[in-house]
């Protein structure tokens, strides 16, 4: 005996149908990892009901006051960021405290970068992240919405 099961179609958004918004996030007093996960979700577009895995549906995120971000525990002195210059003996390192003093934007940028996909789509998403150490940013013309994370 055949039964009728209604078929529901999953909506798949096309790249040209994506509407992007601008959001501004104040990082002062926020924990780095928790802030970075929420920013990564917005960049990927997972906060939207029409999220489609194979299409980049994310929005733009402006982070201000990056120098006032908080790290819990002893991470300021124990967490070390490494990179290599490409030359023999060129391993460089900075602790999180030194990074926060010298390059506070890079601290948030790296945390978000490592949470995004490691492919072309992830690199494209990362270009929509704008991080500033001060409360001012040059994106007022885009009329960004303040968002509380």
UniProtKB/Swiss-Prot annotation:
Cellular component GO terms held in the UniProt record: cytosolic large ribosomal subunit; ribosome
Domain of life where this protein originates: Bacteria
Keywords recorded for this protein, A-Z: Ribonucleoprotein, Ribosomal protein
Pfam families: Ribosomal_L13 (PF00572)
GO MF entries: mRNA binding; structural constituent of ribosome
Coiled-coil features, chain-numbered ranges: none
GO biological process, one term: negative regulation of translation
Disulfide-linked positions: none
Subunit details: Part of the 50S ribosomal subunit.
PANTHER family: LARGE RIBOSOMAL SUBUNIT PROTEIN UL13M, RIBOSOMAL PROTEIN L13
Family: Belongs to the universal ribosomal protein uL13 family.
Function text: This protein is one of the early assembly proteins of the 50S ribosomal subunit, although it is not seen to bind rRNA by itself. It is important during the early stages of 50S assembly.
Protein name: Large ribosomal subunit protein uL13
């Amino acid at each position: 005996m055949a039964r009728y099961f209604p078929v529901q179609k999953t909506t798949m958004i096309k790249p040209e149908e994506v509407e992007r918004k601008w959001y501004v996030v104040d990082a002062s007093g926020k924990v780095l990892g928790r802030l970075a996960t929420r920013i990564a979700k917005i960049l990927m577009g997972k906060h939207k009901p029409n999220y489609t895995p194979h299409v980049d549906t994310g929005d733009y995120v402006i982070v201000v006051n990056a120098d006032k971000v908080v790290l819990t525990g002893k991470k300021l002195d124990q967490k070390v960021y490494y990179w290599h210059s490409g030359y023999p003996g060129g391993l460089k390192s900075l602790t999180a405290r030194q990074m926060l003093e010298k390059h506070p934007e890079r601290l948030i940028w790296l945390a978000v970068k490592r949470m995004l996909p490691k492919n072309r789509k992830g690199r494209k998403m990362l270009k929509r992240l704008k991080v500033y150490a001060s409360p001012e940013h040059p994106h007022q013309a885009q009329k960004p919405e303040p968002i509380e994370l």
